[in-house]
């Protein structure tokens, strides 16, 4: 029985640093004298992990940026693997960032070191056969969604549903009034939150259409306030430029620095790009309209090659197995269509109440004390040695 395991953790993104810190805290309840090294950020360091590289050094997005930084990323991977192997870890845990982590995990597994991948890639959405490659890299997968372990089971891979950390963080009942006060919004006016994505390409595709829809909505809802949280500093100039050309009343439109959760909390309804933000809006119990649009050539390739295996895109709909919220994709993503769907949310409170009850059921399903369950699954794996 291992009393003081050596645990290596790699968090390739800021969200992974957050997950890693919670995991370390829970693992210490199982192994008080455990040692932790890895790649992480401030939160993992505060939890007691000695980081050899910072998470920010791995955080690159987009093909061109990855290619530009590839020599540096390969050097980090090479140096980490060599140094970590010499440290003799009992287990290596990769958190999300599959492009980097799965290769490292496989390298360690081939050297008979236990490996765990925390946060499954979206194999339920596309390229399910990746599960076999993941299984060749890890001894156990820790999944955030309940539909994931059955897919891995078809490939004979040990996968555990641990719940979603965001469902643990967000309370079942949320406080709209406090959020509005924090943002300086009137308590009784209608409020729409607009989230067209976190990447430049997403905002280029969706931003103008979203703002046009919000402008049309304001004609139906006098006094409507629109809050637009910029996901990061890189996005804000583009959003500001799009907002300046929109028909939204200047006094009632609010471009924010980040604050996405506060913006959604303050809102009556959310207009959001398909992605993780839809899950957050669901957990905050906000009715939403979900939209997405990619370049026409990309969409044709995906459809022709049948790369996607889902017919729903919004996470609330995928989790529910039914159409809880409107989805407007590609040619259906027009300002009039978005405006009509948003207006329906504002005008039918009885529908909103039923929707929020369904949200609560899904929230309960996802709230599992993820860090605790993840630590238990890793501790169990360590005791099998």
Curated annotation (Swiss-Prot):
GO terms for biological process: lipid A biosynthetic process. InterPro entries: Glyco_trans_19. One of its GO terms (molecular function) is phospholipid binding. It holds the Pfam family LpxB. Pathway: Bacterial outer membrane biogenesis; LPS lipid A biosynthesis. It comes from the Bacteria. It catalyses: a lipid X + a UDP-2-N,3-O-bis[(3R)-3-hydroxyacyl]-alpha-D-glucosamine = a lipid A disaccharide + UDP + H(+). Keywords: Glycosyltransferase, Lipid A biosynthesis, Lipid biosynthesis, Lipid metabolism, Transferase. Coiled coil: none annotated. One of its GO terms (cellular component) is membrane. Its EC number is 2.4.1.182. Belongs to the LpxB family. NCBIfam families: lpxB. Condensation of UDP-2,3-diacylglucosamine and 2,3-diacylglucosamine-1-phosphate to form lipid A disaccharide, a precursor of lipid A, a phosphorylated glycolipid that anchors the lipopolysaccharide to the outer membrane of the cell. This is Lipid-A-disaccharide synthase. The gene is lpxB.
């Amino acid at each position: 029985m291992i009393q003081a395991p050596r645990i290596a953790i790699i968090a390739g993104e800021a969200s992974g640093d957050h997950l890693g810190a919670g995991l370390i805290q829970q693992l210490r309840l199982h192994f008080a004298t455990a040692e932790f090294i890895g790649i992480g950020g401030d939160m993992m360091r505060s939890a007691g992990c000695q980081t050899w590289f910072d998470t920010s050094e791995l955080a690159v997005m987009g093909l061109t940026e990855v290619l530009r930084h590839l020599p540096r990323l390969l050097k980090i991977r090479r140096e980490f693997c060599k140094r970590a192997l010499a440290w003799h870890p009992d287990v290596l845990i990769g958190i999300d960032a599959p492009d980097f982590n799965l290769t490292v995990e496989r390298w360690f597994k081939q050297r008979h070191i236990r490996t765990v991948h925390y946060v499954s890639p979206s194999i339920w959405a596309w390229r399910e056969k990746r599960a076999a490659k993941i299984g060749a890299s890890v001894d156990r997968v820790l999944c955030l969604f309940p539909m994931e372990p059955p897919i891995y089971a078809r490939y004979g891979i040990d996968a555990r549903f641990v719940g979603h950390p965001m469902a643990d963080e967000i309370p079942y009942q949320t406080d709209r009034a406090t959020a509005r006060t924090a943002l300086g919004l009137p308590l009784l006016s209608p409020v729409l939150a607009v989230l067209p994505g976190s990447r430049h390409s997403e905002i280029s595709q969706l931003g103008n259409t979203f703002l046009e829809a919000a402008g049309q909505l304001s004609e139906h809802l006098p006094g409507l306030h629109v809050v637009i949280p910029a996901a990061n500093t890189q996005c804000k100039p583009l959003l500001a430029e799009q907002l300046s050309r929109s028909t939204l009343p200047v006094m009632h439109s609010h471009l924010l620095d980040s604050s996405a959760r506060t913006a959604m909390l303050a809102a009556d309804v959310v207009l959001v790009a398909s992605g993780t933000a839809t899950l957050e809006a669901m957990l905050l119990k906000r009715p939403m309209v979900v939209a997405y649009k990619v370049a026409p050539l990309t969409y044709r390739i995906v459809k022709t090659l049948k790369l996607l295996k889902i017919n729903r895109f919004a996470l609330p709909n995928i989790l529910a197995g039914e159409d809880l919220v409107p989805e407007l994709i590609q040619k259906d993503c027009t300002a009039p269509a978005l405006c009509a769907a948003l207006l329906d949310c504002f005008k039918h409170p009885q529908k909103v109440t039923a929707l929020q009850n369904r949200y609560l059921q899904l929230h309960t399903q996802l709230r599992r004390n993820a860090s605790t369950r993840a630590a238990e699954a890793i501790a169990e794996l360590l005791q099998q040695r």
